[in-house]
């Protein structure tokens, strides 16, 4: 079984981006939607320059397609994460217009069924945000995510992950990747180097 990849999201500075990549993060996420961690495209471009070897993920919520295209061009974003109510047709168009893979996020308490996921025919990855607090995601939702992963979908697991629970979450689901934001922060948008290093070590354990 391949190790789970790691996405560190909510990066707001080139320094934190470089630290995440130095510790082994595969994906660096920048939030371009309304959020305490939101940054503008110019800042995203600076982060891109700081980590040229990493995969940069731009996070959007119900965006205009032109805004996605501009962000991809300006900040050289590698993957488009859609965190709102985007329909399959929008995901298709985002891929067609940018050439960048799409990560579609589902935030509901119930993980969507296979038929719903299958409608996203050109979507490369699905991210399941299974919990909003700092506890390990509920067992039933972990079971659902694991079942979907076994069907061949490439799954990012997110929600409530931190250094204290990520090892168990990975063991329960064997996701393609884990996604952490708040669980490795000292304050919104500021990463805690110690927590970040511990998180990476637990994923690799």
Where do the language-model regions lie?
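Conserved N-terminal beta1-alpha1 strand-loop-helix module at the mouth
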Residues: 1-205
């Amino acid at each position: 079984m391949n190790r789970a990849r790691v996405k560190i999201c909510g990066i707001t500075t080139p320094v934190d981006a470089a630290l995440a990549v130095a510790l082994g993060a595969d994906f660096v996420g920048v939030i371009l939607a309304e959020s305490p961690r939101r940054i503008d495209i110019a800042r995203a471009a600076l982060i891109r320059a700081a980590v040229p070897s990493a995969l940069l993920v731009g996070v959007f919520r119900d965006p205009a397609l032109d805004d996605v295209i501009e962000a991809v061009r300006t900040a050289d974003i590698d993957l488009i994460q859609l965190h709102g109510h985007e329909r399959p047709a929008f995901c298709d168009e985002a891929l067609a217009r940018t050439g960048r893979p799409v990560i579609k996020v589902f935030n509901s308490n119930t993980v969507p069924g296979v038929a719903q996921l299958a409608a996203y025919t050109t979507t490369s990855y699905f991210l399941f945000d299974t919990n909003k607090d700092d506890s390990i995601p509920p067992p039933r939702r972990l079971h659902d995510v694991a079942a979907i992963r076994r069907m061949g979908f490439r799954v990012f697991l997110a929600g409530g992950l931190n250094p204290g629970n990520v090892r168990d979450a990975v063991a329960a689901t064997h996701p393609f990747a884990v996604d952490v934001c708040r669980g490795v922060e000292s304050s919104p948008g500021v990463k805690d180097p110690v927590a970040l290093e511990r998180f990476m070590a637990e994923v690799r354990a």
